[in-house]
Curated annotation (Swiss-Prot):
Heterodimer of a weakly toxic basic protein having phospholipase A2 activity (RV-4) and a non-toxic acidic protein which inhibits its enzymatic activity but potentiates its lethal potency and neurotoxicity (RV-7). This is Acidic phospholipase A2 RV-7. Disulfide bonds join 42-131, 44-60, 59-111, 65-138, 66-104, 73-97, 91-102. Expressed by the venom gland. One of its GO terms (molecular function) is phospholipid binding. Coiled coil: none annotated. It comes from Daboia siamensis (Eastern Russel's viper). It is found in: Secreted. Heterodimer: RV-4/RV-7 targets the presynaptic sites of the neuromuscular junction. Monomer: snake venom phospholipase A2 (PLA2) RV-7 that has low enzymatic activity and is not toxic. It inhibits the enzymatic activity of RV-4 in vitro but potentiates its lethal potency and neurotoxicity. It may facilitate the specific binding of RV-4 to its presynaptic binding sites, probably by acting as a chaperone, minimizing distraction and destruction of RV-4 en route to the site of action by reducing non-specific binding to muscle and other organs. PLA2 catalyzes the calcium-dependent hydrolysis of the 2-acyl groups in 3-sn-phosphoglycerides. Ca(2+) binds at residues 43, 45, 47, 64. InterPro entries: PLipase_A2 (IPR001211), PLipase_A2_Asp_AS (IPR033112), PLipase_A2_dom (IPR016090), PLipase_A2_dom_sf (IPR036444), PLipase_A2_His_AS (IPR033113). The keyword Disulfide bond applies.
Amino acid sequence: MRTLWIVAVCLIGVEGNLFQFGEMILEKTGKEVVHSYAIYGCYCGWGGQGRAQDATDRCCFVHDCCYGTVNDCNPKTATYSYSFENGDIVCGDNDLCLRTVCECDRAAAICLGQNVNTYDKNYEYYSISHCTEESEQC
């Protein structure tokens, strides 16, 4: 099921939110999202369960929690406005739902960038079957 996330990124194209999130991640980490974050640990990618495996995976856990607070739009498909200004990601929507989605993505991209030096290749393509410990609450 988590591999569906890769397909979703490819199918959504330039208008979809997952593409926008991927651009933010690339800007902050220098890593392509499909190869580095689409299936990483227990939370990066589609769905999530168990305990986050490291700081990178925790960024994805917090991002999932943030998406859980979004009402009135689908955070995985909502298209918002944002820009890169002097290395910062700036969300520009007045619509509360779209702005919230953008801020969730912005915070996660910044978190991933702050933890890029501890990125562990052992968690790339990590099997969800290893994610059996009880999850913390959002």
